[in-house]
Amino acid sequence: PGAGSQEERMQGQMEGQDFSHEERFLSMVRE
């Protein structure tokens, strides 16, 4: 379970980063 939790956390972090990056990109494009 420990390893699974770690993997899940890593995946969530990656998704969050991607979302932030996309938002920034959209903001830049808007400008």
UniProtKB/Swiss-Prot annotation:
Top-level taxon in the UniProt lineage: Eukaryota
The UniProt record lists the keyword Disulfide bond: yes
Keywords: Antimicrobial, Disulfide bond, Fungicide, Plant defense
Segments of skewed composition (Basic and acidic residues): 1-10, 18-31
Gene Ontology process terms (BP): defense response to fungus; killing of cells of another organism
Keyword Disulfide bond: yes
Region ranges (Disordered): 1-31
Entry comment on modification after translation: Disulfide bonds.
Task performed by this protein: Has antifungal activity against C.gloeosporioides but not against B.cinerea and Fusarium sp. or against various yeasts. Has no antibacterial activity.
Family affiliation: Belongs to the 2S seed storage albumins family.
Subunit structure: Heterodimer; disulfide-linked.
Protein name, entry field: Antifungal protein 1
Organism expressing this protein natively: Passiflora alata (Winged-stem passion flower)
